Amino acid sequence: MDLIRNFSIIAHIDHGKSTLADRIIQLCGGLSDREMEAQVLDSMDIERERGITIKAQTAALNYKAKDGKIYNINLIDTPGHVDFSYEVSRSLSACEGALLVVDASQGVEAQTVANCYMALGLGVEVVPVLNKIDLPQADPERAKKEIEDVIGIDASEAVTCSAKTGLGVADVIEEMIARVPPPTGNAEDPLQALIIDSWFDNYVGVVMLVRIVNGTLKPKDKITLMANGSSHLVEHVGVFSPKSVDRPELSAGQVGFVIAGIKELKAAKVGDTVTHSPGQQGRVPASEPLPGFKEVKPQVFAGLYPVESSEYDQLRESLEKLQLNDAALLYEPEVSQALGFGFRCGFLGLLHMEIVQERLERQYGMNLITTAPTVVYQVEQSSGSIISVDNPSKMPEASKINTILEPIVTVNLYMPQEYVGSIITLCVGKRGIQMDMNYLGRQVKLTYELPMAEIVLDFFDKMKSISRGYASMDYEFKEYRPADVVKVDILINGERVDALSVIVHRSNSQSRGREVVAKMRDIIPRQMFDVAIQAAIGSNIVARENVKALRKNVLAKCYGGDISRKRKLLEKQKEGKKRMKQVGNVEIPQEAFLAILQVED
């Protein structure tokens, strides 16, 4: 046990944690040079392209330290993005230590801080590492000071390295071995294993990545998953040295995989506890699960519809397959008058939503229409009952509503001093309430309470463009508060198009209605009859635009001649147009739904 070290790497996006992981694997000889490739642990093509880590991965490596002993080190790679913070907390609770990787040229950023506090809260030993010191603009002294100011851990001893060139990586491992304690736990106790991650493999079913806290696990053992009580027979256990290697047993302190012929991922939830089933000789089930398991609740909802209605079944299958790998994704079928059959999907945040959409389009070749993302509102009806509304079309009539509560989140923003003014303006424009403001070296930390609905649309993009990409943020849910929000409906020729409805704050509902209507006028193609586009709040029309009809010049064949002849032709045309307008329906192009997402303030 004394020679085992479990650690993960915490870093902001692009501070080089995947590259550092590659170097550590290379140094320990986990893969031969031929098998080595950049970002070995990021196995999804989207992960590679965007340079982000989404799913947690592991590598069990052997390292011969300077003191001559061979250490068994388990590296657990974690995502850095705030949307995936649950995955991070699971990975961290499986470790005794974490390397805090900070880019020496950029200093500390928001998500590093969020994940680092999470690590300190879980009692994990944090070892600061300064990366990218080969860059000419690297300033390690300033970065050390920032770590001390912002996070409050001693960084005077921080190891410097360059993951790209491999400089100083051995020192990082030595420091980690010296400072991180070995795992506690007893191989003789009843089995308790934490599921860090689980994914679906087409050949063997669900693969669970577990950290054995107490006890031992061997093939042919019967195991029980404590959250839902289902039992399964273990077929294989082993470790990843990034490649999977079968082992005869996994014992306390180790991290490895378990394959037990589980058919669906919903059974093996991340954060659940695995133990032995009762009634086996010499195997005692654990009396209680490990702490910290919670169901992940989606924060952002959007409708996904296939462009071709015939692809509905295919979309359902793709979502099922995707859910096998992404337990945080929720979906349920819904019907829209404008878009036909589709699904209402729940996501952890905006990045998660983009990635799900991209994976559906890329891995499963779907063509999708996405409706505007919304958050969950709590509506207290006049009858006294409270309902949750995650879809504008489910919002009851205004007369039946007492109060509407909207989710408020606490947002921490970090940015260089020169951008503070413009970021504050942005937050105030989004109905933010400033809670706190700290100067930390050259960085500023702003804390705001903002309605989640304002963040969902375009807050992130705006924040990045105002600050030229230097500002970073993380948010967490605080509470529900009463809010004066209204539903804006878009009517086309007097008919409501449910997929275009949005819920917005009353103060900017009129302007929002006007903008959407103006945008729709440019997008909806001209028909043979006039098309009226209106924005309505309840029964009040707040904006209207017309798309003029295309018309044939019916007088072309009359040269000169009597006015009554011309009038007859014009009247006849007018009658025809009127009749068309009664029966005609307007095709709403795909862009119209996207336009709603990009309405500028």
Curated annotation (Swiss-Prot):
Catalysed conversion reaction: GTP + H2O = GDP + phosphate + H(+)
Broadest EC class assigned to this enzyme: hydrolase
UniProt-listed Enzyme Commission number(s): 3.6.5.n1
Principal subcellular localisation of the protein: membrane
GO biological process: positive regulation of translation
Molecular function GO labels: GTP binding; GTPase activity; guanosine tetraphosphate binding; ribosome binding; translation elongation factor activity
Binding residues annotated for GTP, in chain numbering: 14-19, 131-134
Domain of life of the organism encoding this protein: Bacteria
Record localization: Cell inner membrane
Recorded topology in the membrane: Peripheral membrane protein
PROSITE patterns from the UniProt entry: G_TR_1, G_TR_2
GO CC term (a single one): plasma membrane
UniProt cross-references to InterPro entries, sorted A to Z: EF-4, EFG_III/V, EFG_V-like, EFTu-like_2, G_TR_CS, LepA_C_sf, LepA_CTD, LepA_IV
Pfam families associated with the record: EFG_C (PF00679), GTP_EFTU (PF00009), GTP_EFTU_D2 (PF03144), LepA_C (PF06421)
Function: Required for accurate and efficient protein synthesis under certain stress conditions. May act as a fidelity factor of the translation reaction, by catalyzing a one-codon backward translocation of tRNAs on improperly translocated ribosomes. Back-translocation proceeds from a post-translocation (POST) complex to a pre-translocation (PRE) complex, thus giving elongation factor G a second chance to translocate the tRNAs correctly. Binds to ribosomes in a GTP-dependent manner.
Protein name (database record): Elongation factor 4
Lineage: Bacteria, Pseudomonadati, Pseudomonadota, Betaproteobacteria, Burkholderiales
Gene: lepA
